[in-house]
């Protein structure tokens, strides 16, 4: 039974998708580090330009890239969380869609860490052992097992994913903290809109068109000096 996002559900989402939750998301940039090195988010060299360039980059990922695919996969995992065979197939598909070795490592490492930490509440993924689990699939399944609505889980996941990217941008000295908060404030409406849209999707809605982001993700492993694992 699905419940509305009451106080208990809100607290759980804030806990699971908080930077303090021990999944290690801070170690990954999803290729952003390589994009910065290659000057793809230079924005003309000004602080405002870099802020706008990062906002555009993240908006593309949200609407047409890996973050969109994550949303579709999360929604599907939420729907089939108590059907082990279907949940396994969704996770396998998510892993197959990882566009590079580092992205595969990122989603499986985060998925494993999230699953382990979330066992304090539930482990709806036990039937998938010992197979690796993609991060959005783990989040969707755990959220559904606790009766939290799909749209709320999606919104929290999307916000966390974008916050992680903004944090990476700050650590890469692309933007400052004030600029990062400005970006997150402007992404609130797009996140809410995409969460509502993703609830209505199926696996046929998977697909991305962010080729530059996919390329830098694949090239990142060859970067000589790195702060991040992806």
From Swiss-Prot:
Q: Where in the cell is it found?
A: Cytoplasm
Disulfide bridge positions per record: none
Q: Does the keyword Cytoplasm apply?
A: yes
Molecular-function annotations in GO: nickel cation binding
Q: What is its main location?
A: cytoplasm
Question: GO CC terms for this protein?
Answer: cytoplasm
Q: Which domain of life is it from?
A: Bacteria
UniProt keywords, alphabetically: Chaperone, Cytoplasm, Nickel insertion
Matching entries from Pfam families are given as: UreF (PF01730)
Q: Which family does it belong to?
A: Belongs to the UreF family.
Q: How does it assemble?
A: UreD, UreF and UreG form a complex that acts as a GTP-hydrolysis-dependent molecular chaperone, activating the urease apoprotein by helping to assemble the nickel containing metallocenter of UreC. The UreE protein probably delivers the nickel.
Chain's role: Required for maturation of urease via the functional incorporation of the urease nickel metallocenter.
The protein, known as:
Urease accessory protein UreF
Tell me which species this is from: Allorhizobium ampelinum (strain ATCC BAA-846 / DSM 112012 / S4)
- Recall the taxonomic lineage recorded for the source organism: Bacteria, Pseudomonadati, Pseudomonadota, Alphaproteobacteria, Hyphomicrobiales
What gene name is listed for this protein?
A: ureF
